[in-house]
Swiss-Prot record:
Tissue specificity field: Highly expressed in antigen-presenting cells.
Modified residues (Phosphoserine): S106
PTM notes: Phosphorylated at Ser-106 by RPS6KA5/MSK1, which stimulates the ubiquitin ligase activity.
Knockout mutant characteristics: Deletion mutant protects mice from DNA virus infection.
Subunit structure: Forms homodimers. Interacts with GNIP2. Interacts with GYG1. Interacts with RNF187 (via C-terminus).
Protein name per its UniProtKB record: E3 ubiquitin-protein ligase TRIM7
Organism annotation: Mus musculus
Amino acid sequence: MATVGPRTGPNAGAEALALAAELQGEATCSICLEFFREPVSVECGHSFCRACIMRCWERPGAGTGTATRTLPCPLPCPQCREPARPSQLRPNRQLAAVVSLLRRFSLPPTAPGERGTPAVPARAAAARCSQHGEQLKLYCQDDGRAICVVCDRAREHRSHAVLPLEEAVQEAKELLDSRLRALKKVLEDYEAFRSTEERESKELLKQMAAEKEKVGAEFQALRAFLVEQEGRLLSRLEVLSREVTQKQNENLAQLEGEITQLSKLSGQIQETAQKPDLDFLQEFKSTLSKCSSVPSSKPTTVSSEMKNKVWNVSLKSFVLKGLLKKFKEDLQGELEKEEKVELTLDPDTANPRLILSLDLKSVRLGQRAQDLPNHPRRFDTNTRVLASCGFSSGRHHWEVEVGSKDGWAFGVARESVRRKGLTPFTPEEGVWAMQLNNGQYWAVTSPERTQLNCGHLSRVRVALDLEVGAVSFYAVEDMRHLYTFRVNFQERVFPLFSVCSTGTYLRIWP
């Protein structure tokens, strides 16, 4: 086994001085910052000079007390603030012996003229009280400043909350650290939000660019289609024009021949009629026979078949005009519709069994009722909830993501819809909605529901038109029309959502 001897080397001297300084610190009174004189221990274990602790416990200005002076009990330890009783002060003989040994080494004082005491450790060289000259070892929470043990006994701080300086620093650091952690968390949230915002903005810009291309392509295709149909119709009209012209030319040529023949025959008849009687009778029969070749009916200038063709084209032109007018109106109306409204659910209207998401966009049915205030707008029996905003004019639409299992319904309800007690889900009650029940989609009409012949739905658009009085439902995937309620709205209406099964949900999209 290796023996442990004194340290040698370049750092040995520094280590020895540090050890000596630490030993001096342990033998130094924390009140007077000098070697202990008559060291005594209080109940918490800390030691002080007898005179220092008694002076500290006396009221400032009362003079230097003696051991026989009667002091109130208990009193705080000047170092840790634990309660201590003056009657329980015990001489610390071991500490006195250590101090005696240190004095024999005759270590140099910390500064000239300081009663020959050794240098105090670094922790003892802290700031001192400007009023009493004592080390600032305590912290007054009421005044927010460091004080000495004498200040602590003064009238000014007697009723204040005072902590050891180290403890106050530790508490302040812990509080600052907790605030720093909270600030870092907020900063992380903001950075995450910024990252999400940037990503979503890029995605939206990308989506808008794609939509611009799609719109351009759709209108380009529409223009090409209209040009093609225009060409076909104009070509048909051109063909008919040529046919009419050709028929007209043929008829005119025929008429010209017949007119020439008739004029010639008319001249011959007139010439025969002017001849002498004998010559007239000889040529009469020949001239009369020529008259038998004259057409008995007038020629038609344009055939009925040609007229039918022209009439059909005119009819197409008339229909085209009506279709284009309706198309322009529908297209303009669709493009000028109100933007999709941003909805959130109103928790004050939600049935206690309904569980709303934190963003107030989704609703599902819980196993038991929650303890919620009995708000006058709350549905207490029907498991329904309204949106937070209602509408009294204009055109609006929103989209709803639907669960694949039975037990949901949604649509609109008038503001005065009954909230208390069990009420039917019908237009007579001011509810216009669709639902999924027994695996089948229904429009909730009255007296019987209307079955909707559609495939699986994952998202449905609700279009509310208060100008014409209509509530329409569309399958978002292909914008297929599902059903339209015709309503004479007399008051404000609110989007309505209902979930009556724990296996499904509804969510306002997105």
